[in-house]
Curated annotation (Swiss-Prot):
Name of the gene encoding the protein in the UniProt record: cbiD
Full protein name: Cobalt-precorrin-5B C(1)-methyltransferase
Pathway named in the protein's UniProt entry: Cofactor biosynthesis; adenosylcobalamin biosynthesis; cob(II)yrinate a,c-diamide from sirohydrochlorin (anaerobic route): step 6/10
Entries under HAMAP family matching the protein: CbiD (MF_00787)
Keyword Ion transport in annotation: no
PANTHER family recorded: COBALT-PRECORRIN-5B C(1)-METHYLTRANSFERASE (PTHR35863:SF1)
Organism of derivation: Prochlorococcus marinus (strain MIT 9515)
GO biological process entries: anaerobic cobalamin biosynthetic process; methylation
Alphabetically ordered keywords of this record: Cobalamin biosynthesis, Methyltransferase, S-adenosyl-L-methionine, Transferase
One MF term in the entry's GO annotations: cobalt-precorrin-5B C1-methyltransferase activity
Similarity annotation: Belongs to the CbiD family.
Length: 372
């Protein structure tokens, strides 16, 4: 598989080139990017950089190469506009020296209007830009994705309360397809590292970037691993490594598949989400007219909205049942391959990234996730 790098690195490459141009340094067609807590430097190609607005601002441009042909950010055009502002504060906190501004095509939180950017992305930007920032100045950095608003329509961003464009929520330097063997290999390596350094009785498996971002924003102290679509094999690997508890944390659109016994969750391999929901609705004796409506829903999110508009208590009952079924099916899956006492807990959030449901095992932990 072709190697690629996550969106934060390409944004940082363009930004670093713009700041250097603004401070009088010559343009280079690549930038060496530092990664927090990593000695290696990553070479990021930059398309161009130049002075604009009477030479008071600089524009840096790069094109993201995630290495993933189907990734929405592959070949994404990135603009970063840098502007230096004199500061007279002697003891400025370094966090105050860079102001990141969401420009056109960059996702913002629907409730707060703040830029949707991960902790990792901020750390990469600050790590690389603070060292080239002239003394006595602060940096205003506007990030623009010219095609971001259009491309965001192909994502589930809006379902998570992210509007106006694409979020910058990469959480590692390298990229892996969630369905590729490299993703499985990387997750197994993370699990091995966690177990070999410190013995943890409980770990958290998250499915996608939104789940990872949400989990890392909480006060949970357990190790967190992004498992992509390889949930089944990684549950077995965790049991083999004598982990006591695994908390499955994710969006209902993914975790619902586990309730149907589907443990490789990529959509091109298996979907059946509506069918699984209808099956659970029958088991819970949901009125037949509602079951008919659920079966005609175009997606799980529409089905949930339909349920909640009709009966919020019934919706909660069904989704808690789903969470409980995820836990039970996970235990049954493990027993096919290994004799183990490992507990599997399920905690599920909705499209607004609100943590809402859990199975019986997850009830012991859901309050900790909500407490942030």
């Amino acid at each position: 598989m072709k190697k690629g790098f996550s969106l934060p690195l390409w944004v940082t490459g363009a930004a670093k080139s713009a700041v250097k141009k603004l401070t009088g340094l010559p343009f280079e067609d690549y930038e060496l990017i530092k990664i927090p807590n990593d000695k290696n430097l990553i070479k990021i190609k930059v398309h161009s950089a130049g002075l604009i607005k009477d030479e008071s601002h600089a524009l840096g441009i790069s094109f993201a190469d995630s290495g993933l042909d189907l990734d929405v950010t592959q070949n994404l055009e990135i603009w970063t506009i840098a502007f230096l502002e004199k500061t007279y504060e002697k003891d400025n906190n370094s966090l105050d020296l860079i102001n990141i501004i969401p420009g056109y095509g960059v996702g913002i939180d629907q409730k707060t209007s703040e830029i949707c950017i991960s902790k990792f992305a901020k750390e990469v930007l600050f790590e690389n830009l603070l060292e080239i920032l002239p003394a006595g100045y602060k940096l205003n950095l506007e990030i623009i994705f010219p095609n971001g608003k259009f491309l965001a329509e192909r994502t589930s961003n809006q379902s998570f309360g992210i509007v106006q464009g694409l979020s910058i929520i990469g959480t590692s330097a390298e990229t892996f397809s969630s369905a590729s063997p490299d993703q499985l290999k990387n997750a197994k390596a993370q699990l091995e590292k966690i177990v070999s350094h410190d013995f943890y009785e409980t770990i958290i498996f998250v499915i996608g970037e939104n789940g990872l971002h949400l989990a890392k924003s909480s006060n949970i102290k357990f190790p967190i691993i992004k498992v992509g679509n390889w949930i089944g094999p990684l549950l077995v690997d965790a049991a083999l490594k004598k982990i006591k508890r695994v908390i499955l944390f994710g969006y209902h659109g993914k975790l619902i598949k586990l309730a149907g016994g589907i443990f490789h969750t990529h959509n091109h391999l298996a979907d059946a989400r509506i069918e699984i929901l209808v099956y659970l609705a029958v088991k819970e004796e949901v009125p037949i007219e509602m079951i008919k409506k659920l079966s005609l829903a175009s997606n799980v999110e529409d089905a949930l909205l339909l349920l909640e508009s009709s009966s919020p208590s019934l919706a909660d009952k069904l989704w808690n049942k789903l969470s409980d079924t995820v836990e039970k099916r996970s235990s049954e899956y493990l027993k096919r391959y290994i004799t183990t006492d490992m507990k599997v807990a399920a905690i599920i959030f909705d499209r607004q990234r609100k943590i809402r449901w859990s199975g019986d095992n997850g009830k012991d932990y859901i309050s900790s996730f909500k407490g942030f």
